[in-house]
């Protein structure tokens, strides 16, 4: 319950962060609804501050816009899961859930990306078969690191050609 109550603050941050891009969000109403949700969870309880933030800290490590969209997709999914266990008959919970679903539909599906990262972390790099496959793929991986994406390459080439 402590994690859930503190997460409500992060929910506010996410809603506000996407508020400037999603014109349909009514931030004043959402803030009021989130305040009601905080009251539902008694988030003013002293244990909420214990241990510091649990989600906002994770966002600091994700600096690029596309990276943030991946992690925010996961965070929005967590909030939707949290709200599944609440009284959906309350108008403020229903409204927050609807807005989160709208945001989720506008974010990339981060689940597959997270699964890919987890799968990579599980690879046993001391296994000879895995080492053979990895060695076989190393040059391709390095090429992806060195080569700029084709759209950036085309744009930079056209900028170099122009003698304006």
UniProtKB/Swiss-Prot annotation:
Record's signal peptide: 1-19
GO molecular function: cytokine activity; type II interferon receptor binding
GO biological process: adaptive immune response; defense response to virus; humoral immune response; macrophage activation; response to interleukin-18
Annotated Gene Ontology cellular component terms: extracellular space
Glycan-modified residues: 42, 61
Sorted UniProt keywords: Antiviral defense, Cytokine, Glycoprotein, Growth regulation, Secreted, Signal
Record-linked Pfam families: IFN-gamma
Subcellular location: Secreted
SUPFAM superfamilies xref list: 4-helical cytokines
Organism superkingdom: Eukaryota
Gene3D superfamilies associated with the record: 1.20.1250.10
Subunit structure: Homodimer.
Functional summary from the UniProt entry: Produced by lymphocytes activated by specific antigens or mitogens. IFN-gamma, in addition to having antiviral activity, has important immunoregulatory functions. It is a potent activator of macrophages, it has antiproliferative effects on transformed cells and it can potentiate the antiviral and antitumor effects of the type I interferons.
Similarity comment text for this entry: Belongs to the type II (or gamma) interferon family.
Protein name: Interferon gamma
């Amino acid at each position: 319950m402590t994690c859930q109550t503190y997460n409500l603050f992060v929910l506010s941050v996410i809603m506000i962060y996407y508020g400037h891009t999603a014109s349909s969000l009514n931030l004043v109403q959402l803030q009021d609804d989130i305040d009601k949700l905080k009251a539902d969870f008694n988030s003013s309880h002293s244990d909420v501050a214990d241990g510091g933030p649990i989600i906002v800290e994770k966002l600091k490590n994700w600096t690029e816009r596309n990276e943030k969209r991946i992690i925010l997709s996961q965070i929005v999914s967590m909030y939707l899961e949290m709200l599944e266990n609440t009284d959906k008959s309350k108008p403020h919970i229903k409204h927050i859930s609807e807005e989160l679903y709208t945001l989720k539909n506008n974010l990339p599906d981060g689940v597959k990306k997270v699964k890919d990262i987890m799968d990579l972390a599980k690879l046993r790099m001391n296994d000879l078969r895995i080492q053979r496959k990895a060695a076989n793929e190393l040059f391709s991986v390095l090429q992806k690191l060195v080569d700029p994406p084709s759209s950036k390459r085309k744009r930079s080439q056209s900028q170099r050609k122009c003698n304006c």
